[in-house]
């Protein structure tokens, strides 16, 4: 299941988006929510790449992201958080 790490901004109550270690695996560490991430474009691209490179996705937190023109064919998601996400033109 995804980690319920809160955003590093103390006044923010949002859940932090997933981060990745040097090997490209989901890391269970503190981070920012999408609104406070210093580089939201980079965070979104890392999540897109993770989805692209894995068929079985476990524990991914993407709260608040917009997914556009992404191919989810044969992808399986387990214990992931897509709260407040927007999905457009998925395949």
Where are these regions (language model features)?
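Cysteine-rich micro-motifs
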Residues: 24-37
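Tandem repeat scaffolds
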Residues: 2-27, 43-91
């Amino acid at each position: 299941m995804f980690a319920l790490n809160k955003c590093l901004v103390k006044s923010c109550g949002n859940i932090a988006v997933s981060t990745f270690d040097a090997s490209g695996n989901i890391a269970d560490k503190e981070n920012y929510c999408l609104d406070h991430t210093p580089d939201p474009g980079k965070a979104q691209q890392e999540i897109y790449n993770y989805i692209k490179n894995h068929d079985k996705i476990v524990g991914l937190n993407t709260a608040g992201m917009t997914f556009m023109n992404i191919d989810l064919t044969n992808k399986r998601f387990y214990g992931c958080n897509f709260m407040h996400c927007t999905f457009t033109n998925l395949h």
